[in-house]
Swiss-Prot record:
It comes from the Bacteria. It comes from Synechococcus sp. (strain WH7803). Catalyzes amidations at positions B, D, E, and G on adenosylcobyrinic A,C-diamide. NH(2) groups are provided by glutamine, and one molecule of ATP is hydrogenolyzed for each amidation. InterPro entries: Class_I_gatase-like, CobQ/CobB/MinD/ParA_Nub-bd_dom, CobQ_GATase1, CobQ_synth, GATase_3, P-loop_NTPase. CDD domains: GATase1_CobQ (cd01750). This is Cobyric acid synthase. NCBIfam families: cobQ (TIGR00313), PRK00784.1 (NF001989). The active site is at residues 329, 437. Belongs to the CobB/CobQ family. CobQ subfamily. The keyword Membrane does not apply. Residues 248-445 form the GATase cobBQ-type domain. Keywords: Cobalamin biosynthesis, Glutamine amidotransferase. One of its GO terms (molecular function) is catalytic activity.
Length: 494
């Protein structure tokens, strides 16, 4: 089990690295995180919802993601409330103060069922577990579902990861170990220092001090590698990145309060000529080459924030003065004219009494929320941007409700339910949107979309002969595993 001294210590990527290293050694690694809290989600081939970080770990292990790898997913939706997903299916919502009372036993049952499924399907496999947050939140230890309760249940050997970039790494480690209960401390088999900058021999004295004062070996010092991967559950590190050398296009991405599935932007972040700039409500939109509105867990509430902050009006002016705007899932819904949420699923508190709200009005769409979630992988040929040869795209749907056009407009895809395109004003502005998460993963289509922006700027066109982003992601996982093998001694864990 990979534990961390805090959230954001690097557990998810270290778990992914461990999975890839074990795969290289001929083993069958099985990534597993009993409970995750994240709005960055993936849909498995069976239509089950799971955290994206466990999907990434599955790819690192050379496996197809499956929701049994993340049997409990909590999706925050504001006001201390989360949607509860068990084994890929939504089973209700819960307030934080009622979680232990109402959901602890069902959650533990779901975790054991997920373990049973993985172990039955892969009797030769080795479970590679990821903890959550810190394992020693003393006010939460009785409710722990995914850290040391699970480690004790499985008698797992644990690696404790600490992020030296944040500072205070010695206090992080010593404090965490001091708060472990006597029965838990023997589970810790090694320590790992993550995100070290500079020559590793500069940490030799610190390594000796830790081993002398804790009695636990430091199994490795991982170098700073955050340029390889966006952070798994936080935008903080992504936003701290400097401007790319050679960036020719700037794309403004709206940092919605209930932002979800920001991994949709990974392929654009990976483009060497593209600079992403995250814009929160209340911040100036500026003059980007395009605006992207990503998904939202609380679409109406976030739309209300765009309206009240003036950022929504700025996006409207940008599009009608010739700009390009693209929305994914909730972002596309916001681009429409009318949104109705009679059941209050998407933040009705910000809407009118009947759950209705006016959208940004850049696409002639009406969305009505309700019914079962759409959870499925899709593939379709595309009609826009118009160019030859015809391209196809793949991705997944993850949304509630139904959207339809109020007046004739162009379809983004051959399947008319997957997206729409409309002109904005008389200066060449265009708005487009899709329900397809992962659309930017499709290399040829992504390059074709970027080339529309490059034409506006008089820039040379990029080649559309670009592989699916999964190939680049796999190469990054290899580089991560290379560093892990170089800098970490795994033997005490195996």
């Amino acid at each position: 089990m990979v534990l961390g001294t805090s959230s954001g210590a690097g557990k998810s990527l270290m778990t992914a690295a461990l999975c890839r290293v074990l795969k290289r050694r001929g083993e069958t690694p099985l990534p597993f995180k009993g409970q995750n809290m994240s709005n960055n989600a993936w849909v498995d081939p069976g239509g089950g919802e799971m955290a994206y970080s466990q999907a990434l770990q599955a790819w690192a292990a050379g496996r197809e993601p499956e929701c049994a790898m993340n049997p409990v997913l909590l999706k925050p939706q504001g006001d201390s409330t989360s949607e509860v997903i068990h084994l890929g299916r939504s089973v209700g919502t819960c307030r934080a103060e009622h979680y232990y009372r109402d959901w602890f036993r069902p959650g533990w049952a779901a975790i054991r069922q997920g373990l049973h499924t993985l172990e039955n399907e892969n009797p030769e496999g080795r479970l590679v577990l990821e903890g959550a947050g810190s394992p020693v939140e003393v006010n939460l230890q009785a409710r722990d579902l995914t850290n040391l309760r699970l480690a004790q249940y499985l008698r797992a050997r644990c690696l404790l990861v600490a992020d030296i970039e944040r500072g205070g790494v010695f206090a992080q480690i010593v404090g965490t170990l001091a708060l472990l209960r006597p029965v838990e401390r023997p589970l810790i088999s090694g320590l790992l220092i993550n995100r070290f900058r500079g020559r590793r021999e500069l940490f030799d004295e610190g390594r000796r001090w830790l081993e002398q004062h804790t009695g636990i070996p430091v199994l490795g010092v991982m170098p700073w590698l955050d340029e390889l991967f966006p952070p798994e559950d936080s935008l903080d590190l992504l936003e701290r990145r400097g401007r790319k050398r050679g960036a020719e296009l700037e794309i403004a991405v709206l940092k919605l309060p209930s932002l979800s599935n920001f991994s949709d932007l990974d392929p654009l972040e990976a483009e060497p000529t593209v600079q992403l700039r995250w814009v929160a409500p209340g911040e100036p939109l500026g003059t980007p080459d395009a605006v992207v509105i990503p998904g939202s867990k609380q679409t109406l509430r976030d739309l209300g924030r765009l309206h009240s902050s003036g950022l929504g009006s700025a996006v409207q002016r940008f599009a009608r003065s010739g700009g390009a705007v693209f929305g994914v899932c909730g972002g596309m819904q916001m681009l429409g004219q009318e949104l109705e949420d009679p059941e209050g699923l998407e933040g009705q508190a910000a809407a009118g009494g009947n759950g209705a709200m006016t959208g940004l009005g850049l696409l002639p769409l009406r969305t009505r929320f309700g019914g079962e979630k759409a959870l499925r992988h899709r593939q379709s040929s595309v009609h826009w941007p118009e160019h030859q040869p015809t391209l196809s795209v793949e991705g997944f749907e993850l949304h509630r409700g139904h959207t339809h056009a109020l007046e004739p407009c162009s379809n983004l895809c051959e399947d008319p339910s997957l997206g729409w395109v409309a002109r904005c004003g008389d200066q060449g502005g265009i708005a487009a949107g899709t329900y397809l998460h992962g659309i930017f993963d499709n290399g040829p289509w992504r390059r074709r979309w970027l080339n529309q922006l490059r034409i506006r700027r008089g820039l040379e066109l990029l080649s559309e002969q670009q592989p699916h982003h999964s190939r680049q992601r796999d190469a990054l996982l290899d580089r991560l595993a290379d560093a892990f093998e170089t800098h970490v001694n795994l033997e005490p864990l195996l």
